[in-house]
A protein has these predicted regions:
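Short, low-complexity N-terminal intrinsically disordered segments enriched in polar/charged residues
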Residues: 20-48, 56
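A solvent-exposed, acidic/Ser-Thr-rich amphipathic alpha-helical stretch
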Residues: 69-98
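Short, solvent-exposed secondary-structure junction/capping segments
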Residues: 58-71
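N-terminal signal peptide c-region/cleavage motif recognized by signal peptidases
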Residues: 14-16
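Positively charged n-region of N-terminal signal peptides that target proteins for export
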Residues: 1-6, 19-20
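Exposed beta-sheet edge and beta->alpha loop/turn motif
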Residues: 93-167
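Sequence contexts marking disulfide-bonded cysteines in secreted/extracellular proteins
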Residues: 22-26, 66-68, 126-128
């Protein structure tokens, strides 16, 4: 009985460790072309204020904890679930914040591939990437704020899956 339990436990541990994807900088090289395509489209959509192109780069619904508080908010959660319709109505504006526009225009590919940070998304059990920008500078009165976008490969294309903040 003890042997059977140990065997089952060993198989479960082995299965769990071998099923985890490796998410590190080597993934950046493998995904380089797709990330470049994403960034080129993203940069162009922001430059031209094209919300249709931006919506094509998002997987709906996606969570956003700093999205615009307006009449589209329907509950008291600390984040908003951004649907296609709420995006089209007003939430697309998060992509036209001057600090984001400035940061996006600073980078070009392939030399700036490092702006994407790989991580293992424990919710989706997939490798994802984050990129960020400083939304509010730190000063003596407040700690500052950084906005992040998480992207993930979905059906052979990268899509924005969430937007969040750190302070």
């Amino acid at each position: 009985m003890t042997r059977s339990l140990l065997l089952i436990l060993g198989l479960l541990v082995a299965s769990n460790s071998f099923s985890q994807q490796k998410c590190d900088c080597s993934n950046l090289q493998a995904d380089k072309i797709l990330l470049q395509n994403f960034w080129t489209t993203f940069k162009d959509a922001i430059k031209n204020k094209n919300k249709t192109k931006l919506s094509n780069l998002c997987r709906f619904p996606f969570n956003c904890d700093y999205c615009i508080l307006d009449s589209t908010k329907t509950d008291d959660k600390p984040y908003h679930k951004i649907t296609k319709s709420s995006f089209d109505e007003s939430q697309y504006q998060i992509f036209f914040i001057p600090r984001l526009v400035q940061e996006v225009n600073k980078h070009s590919f392939p030399q700036d591939l490092f702006i994407f940070l790989p991580y293992f998304n424990t919710v989706d059990k997939k490798c994802s990437y984050s990129f960020s920008y400083i939304a509010i500078d730190e000063n003596a009165e407040r700690p500052g704020m950084q906005h992040f976008f998480d992207i993930q490969k979905i059906n052979g294309q990268f899509k924005i899956i969430s937007a969040w903040t750190v302070p």
